[in-house]
Amino acid sequence: MATLEQRLTDLLEAPVVALGFELWGIEFIRAGNHSTLRVFIDGENGVTVENCAEVSHQVGAIMDVEDPITEEYFLEVSSPGLDRPLFKVAQFEKYVGQEAAVQLRMATNNRRKFKGVIKAVQGDMITLTVDGKDDVLAFTNIQKANIVPNFG
């Protein structure tokens, strides 16, 4: 069974692409009585506040009609930012050579949190170099991953 995020991606990807943007990823966060649907978009020339408003209007209309989330929630549309989350294997491939912070669902080598350079991607296996040692992580075991911005 597909996750809520996957069902929402399937529902929203084509309309976002039709507006000229890439649907970078989706997060649905429940925190007490408040839930937030975060839709991350990216564009060839970046993303402006006006772009986010345009996509938010379209996504909001689709969500109102399709009603895939029964509870109340806030809709946020934004660019992924410098510390962009990584949702897809292809996004890891795009950032080979960059540093990433990765949190796993289940421990690998007695660890759930890794911070290292994305060395390689083969199939759904991600190789991170952490302190000079390679750790191979299954994409399906990754709970959350973000690029670590380099300001140096």
From Swiss-Prot:
InterPro entries: Ribosome_maturation_RimP (IPR003728), RimP_C (IPR028998), RimP_C_sf (IPR036847), RimP_N (IPR028989), RimP_N_sf (IPR035956). One of its GO terms (cellular component) is cytosol. One of its GO terms (biological process) is translation. It comes from the Bacteria. Its main location: cytoplasm. It is found in: Cytoplasm. The keyword ATP-binding does not apply. Keywords: Cytoplasm, Ribosome biogenesis. Required for maturation of 30S ribosomal subunits. Belongs to the RimP family. This is Ribosome maturation factor RimP. It comes from Aeromonas salmonicida (strain A449).
